[in-house]
């Protein structure tokens, strides 16, 4: 099938879908015919965040009557494997792709290849340079960093020594969070001294733990820490607990998992900036299907960001974000 012919055929296959993107009623199921396949490609396959993305994508697939192909690299620093996954699903002739790019530059060419081959791509979670894609569905990551800075600054009364433990070079989402965090500190908390701002935790909880352990040894008088994602937050939590500093050092992290939620409850974490990964996965699939149906889709979909603390973690809204329903994956 030629690249020009593919969108026409897919439009016909999907023309029976009765969908509303994000209103009171969800998208309806598809009609008959061959079931289109949407490839959903995360940055990795292990973190709780990606499981929640998968749950959202699966829910959208069920409601829209499309098949979800969930496939990604095992590790969040394996750019080459993610590129290979994108190339593989292009060769399979999927109807569309929803991609969380590991690197904002390295994935540009594969996305361009998909679009040129008539396969629409929706970017989710983390941005991509250029504009060769259909839509971008994500948290306002800069604002997430701002929320983290304001909460940590307030916890410290506007004064103190802190560490910023970055995530991974090339990750657009966490870079935006780190930038928002530092900008907010500069603007509102001049009495806070950032002792470290250029150290990267790496893609795993183990490398994050090793970095945090080293930094806690170098800066025993640190009073606060901010981490921009799940793995850096968990690795740092472990280092704080093993050094008996958990609860003493004000600690604000990002994203959730059962162990991070328990640490918030125990007072070892003082705030978790929360995204809505189920919504990200869900709307990523919705946007690509709407595009295939010939509908106009927004360039940018903001899925929201908030912060969980010990004071609000039992409210229904926050509980749903801290412990999302993943039962559709069972």
Language model features by range: what are they?
Residues 22-330:
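A residue-level marker of the well-folded mature domains of exported/periplasmic proteins
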Residues 1-11:
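Bacterial N-terminal signal peptides that target proteins for export
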Residues 9-20:
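Bacterial N-terminal signal peptides
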């Amino acid at each position: 099938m030629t690249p020009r012919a593919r969108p026409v055929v897919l439009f016909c296959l999907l023309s029976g879908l009765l969908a509303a993107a994000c209103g009171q009623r969800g998208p309806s199921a598809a009609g008959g015919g061959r079931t289109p396949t949407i490839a959903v490609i995360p940055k990795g396959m292990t973190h709780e965040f990606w499981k929640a993305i998968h749950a959202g994508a699966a829910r959208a697939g069920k409601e829209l009557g499309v098949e979800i192909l969930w496939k990604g690299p095992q590790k969040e620093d394996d750019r080459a494997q993610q590129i290979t996954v994108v190339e593989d699903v292009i060769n399979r002739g999927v109807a569309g792709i929803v991609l969380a790019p590991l690197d904002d530059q390295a994935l540009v060419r594969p996305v361009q290849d998909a679009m040129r081959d008539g396969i629409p791509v929706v970017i989710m979670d983390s941005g991509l340079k250029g504009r060769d894609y259909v839509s971008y569905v994500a948290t306002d990551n800069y604002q997430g960093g701002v929320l983290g800075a304001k909460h940590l600054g307030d916890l410290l009364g506007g004064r103190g020594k802190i560490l910023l433990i970055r995530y991974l070079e090339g990750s657009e989402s966490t870079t935006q969070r780190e930038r928002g965090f530092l900008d907010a500190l500069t603007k509102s908390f001049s009495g806070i001294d950032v002792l470290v701002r250029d150290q990267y935790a790496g893609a795993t909880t183990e490398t994050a733990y090793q970095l945090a352990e080293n930094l806690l040894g170098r800066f025993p008088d640190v009073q606060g820490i901010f981490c921009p994602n799940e793995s850096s937050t968990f690795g740092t939590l472990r280092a704080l607990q093993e050094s008996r500093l958990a609860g003493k050092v004000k600690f604000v992290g990002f994203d959730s998992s059962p162990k991070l939620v328990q640490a918030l409850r125990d007072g070892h974490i003082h705030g978790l900036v929360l995204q809505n990964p189920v919504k990200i996965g869900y709307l990523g699939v919705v946007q690509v299907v709407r595009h295939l149906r010939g509908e106009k889709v927004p360039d940018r979909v903001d899925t929201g960001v908030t912060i969980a603390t010990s004071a609000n973690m039992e409210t229904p809204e926050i509980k749903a974000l801290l412990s999302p329903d993943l039962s559709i994956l069972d």
